[in-house]
Amino acid sequence: MSCVQQAAQHRSKPRGNTRAIGMPPIAHHPAPAAPDIAYRRATRGEQPAVYQGVVVARQQGRMRCVQLDQISRGTGTDAGVRNAQRLRGTNAGLIVEPASAGYSTLRHYIARLQRQALAVFEQAQFFGCIDQHIRIRAHAEASARRGKCPHREHAVAQIRLGDRAQTDDRAAGDDRLQFVRIHVRGVHQTPARIHRRVGQQPLHRTLPGPGQAGIHFTLLFGDMDVDGAIGERHQRRQLRRGDRTQAVRRQPKHRIRQRFQAVSAVVQQACETIDAVNQAALRRAGSGTAEIRMRIEHRQQAETDAGVGGRGGDALGHFAGMRVRRTAHGVVQIVEFADAGEAAFEHFHIRLFGDRLQAVRIEPVDEAVHQLAPAPEAVAAASADFGQPRHAALEGMAVQIAQARQQHVAARVGQGSSGTGLQRGDAALLCRDPHPARPAVGQQRPGGPEHLHLLVSHWTPSIAELIVYTYQTPRACAMHCDVLWHNAQLMTLDAADGGLGIVDDGTVACQQGRIVYAGPAAQAPALQPHATHDCQRRWISPGLIDCHTHLVYAGNRANEFEQRLRGASYADIAAAGGGIVATVRATRAADDAALLAASLPRLDAMLGEGVTTLEIKSGYGLTLDDEIKQLRVARQLAALRKVEVVPTFLGAHAVPPGGDAQRYTDQVCTQMIPAIAAQGLAEAVDVFCEHLAFSHAQAEQVFIAAQAHGLHIKIHAEQLSNQHGAELAARYGALSADHIEYLDQAGIAAMAGAGTVAVLLPGAFYFTRDTQVPPIAALRAAGVPLALATDCNPGTSPLTSPLLAMNMAATLFRMTVDECIAGFTREAARALGRSERLGRLRAGMDCDLAIWDIDAPADLVYRMGFNPLHARVLRGHLC
């Protein structure tokens, strides 16, 4: 079957059914939700613009698709119960809440749904248009060999991207000019084992660890069946859809060839784009790849026992078998499907990335599902080639496939065309938890043996699909958005050369908190905003990100400032009972309300200079209860102000008064980190590796405990001396190493190799009157990302101004204007592990903006005591 032909067949299916390999249909004009996950951009091609979720469930033996944007608004258990009661037994689906409200409602809804949820899908939309010289008629799929789509559906084709949209009047006057919407869709972990009372099960798998690739795209489309269509150029065939019969007219030969030529360019570009994403994921993960090639063949086959035979008749679809062989990468599975009738499938390529290879075999069955265990040699190959422990491979590689030989008739409602067994049979992709309960031999899965079931492990990569829908006018496929900022100058921070990515006449469009377009107004797609803002040539940048602060504390250390002016050093003050331990005493004595009241003015000062995201570290409690208190107050700050707070546990900030460093380190690792991770109070663990704090070995002990509990790693390193802490942190994949004034070449090389961000803190350098400048030139030459932060703290950097920190970095560290602005946006997002959705103006990113009254970007760095902020935007909302 051809690629567009298969896409056309998929588009024509009723919305209540899935297509082969478990991919569901979608609505004509989705009103997308915004899941947590953003797809990585490819090296070229359009960028992900809008996200939408789909839940696939089974009802009365048939597959139903549920759009996430159909869920009624609400949060928590009550909303989930209410939605389930209201929608139970209907085809309408879930529905809901914006991603900013989390997935609580969705989890509770699925937990109480009588239908069994089988898969959760996400999709990203791209927008482009057909070149004016390409003439493609509407309903292009009508020329497909067997008339897959009814006339009322939108045409399906593959279109070249990148051309500017035609004007409305030209497009409206010519029905051959069409605009396109392209969807890339992925399936993620299914909430198949949600606890019905509490709804405890995340919808998405955890972040990939070392050696795992975090992104996977698989193309599930073939090419056009041009020859078959030409052979029946004027033939009229009947296509039954329930009680309705529609006649499909074949298009002339030249139109079919013309359409095929138009399709080829974008198919090639789509393949290259998705391959680029896959290769980037593999490079990041450092893992191998294995390919499963499923070759679906067709042949004429008469089934005398069913009374089926002859060309064009109804046929039986069944599996002919599968061969498994080993390769250098592990196992390559070649699957051959034999299908009667008129099916003409092309090759399907499914690539498995990461550390899971699956060895299975396919057997025809009549009434039961047989458990098919992975071949021992395949498990050994997977373990050897991908570094996965053997027991984990055995637990996670349970793949079961059941296919009954049954008769599929072309007239069956919603089962696709004749001769296509895979399309006619309902198919489901069911992702299980890491240790699935395997059914006993003979036990049926929901839906019975007529369904193809593919049970995969928790670590199985996502599957995606490229579909293109064409529209006759720009307005028909206009990109709907909530807010549009226009007549602006942009600093996108998304330039290929690492610069500011300046756009002179720019536009930013936002839909449900995500950017759907950011770039030149002249190249913007057709947009239909609900609200518009004329920026009057002001500058728009990503919202500022302060990636290193100690914002939550009590007390005042102005007396230490006076001591430092008289010549006392940091070590002298600490030895006299001052420094960090002085703030520890004050913070322990303060309750939540006092800490909150003391922290709010500092936070407000940062927000007033365009900060939309900041990290807040603990570290002034040094007991479990007091550290939790600090993290709890950090969460309260995020609830009281429109800002995203990233909490970091810094229990290993200093040794408590009268304590022992090793004994306290053991307490941090065995008591504090497990408790804080269990409560979800922190995303990362930091440690102060210095001769007056924690040693190299103790820092490593903290890192091991943090990784064991799934927390990111950060470090205060080389601030006062070279303890080789940055090199250690890089070895453990740390997000960032901060301060690093005394960093040596070995540490620079380690950070460059690991992608660890260098967080520079000019405020602390200035305030302590340090003379050891961080090795900026060497870091720059090695390609280490350079982030900036205020290091807001009471002792060494009582600074709440990111704009002043930029000026200090330029003046003291000789950083460029571009580096200073990138340090508080793009690179700061990377230091917090949020580069996929923050720090740049790009489709698919969170719509966090700072709008400035300046003449040029250099004004942000050049002027001191100057605040040119005009407006701050968080998730598309003015603050």
Curated annotation (Swiss-Prot):
GO biological process, one term: L-histidine catabolic process to glutamate and formamide
Annotated residues for binding of N-formimidoyl-L-glutamate: Y620, N793, G795
Binding site for Zn(2+): H548, H550, H716, D791
Function field: Catalyzes the hydrolytic cleavage of the carbon-nitrogen bond in imidazolone-5-propanoate to yield N-formimidoyl-L-glutamate. It is the third step in the universal histidine degradation pathway.
Gene Ontology MF term list: imidazolonepropionase activity; iron ion binding; zinc ion binding
Listed GO CC annotations: cytoplasm
Predominant cellular place of this UniProt entry's protein: cytoplasm
Cofactor annotation: Zn(2+); Fe(3+)
Keywords: Cytoplasm, Histidine metabolism, Hydrolase, Iron, Metal-binding, Zinc
UniProt-annotated stretches for the region Imidazolonepropionase: 479-879
Pathway: Amino-acid degradation; L-histidine degradation into L-glutamate; N-formimidoyl-L-glutamate from L-histidine: step 3/3
Stated family: Belongs to the metallo-dependent hydrolases superfamily. HutI family.
Subcellular location: Cytoplasm
Cofactor binding note from Swiss-Prot or TrEMBL: Binds 1 zinc or iron ion per subunit.
Species the sequence originates in: Xanthomonas oryzae pv. oryzae (strain KACC10331 / KXO85)
The protein's Enzyme Commission number: 3.5.2.7
Amino-acid positions noted as binding 4-imidazolone-5-propanoate in the UniProt annotation, renumbered to this chain: R557, Y620, H653, Q719, T796
Top-rank EC class of the record's enzyme: hydrolase
UniProt-recorded name of the protein: Imidazolonepropionase
Region (Unknown): 1-478
UniProt keyword rRNA-binding present: no
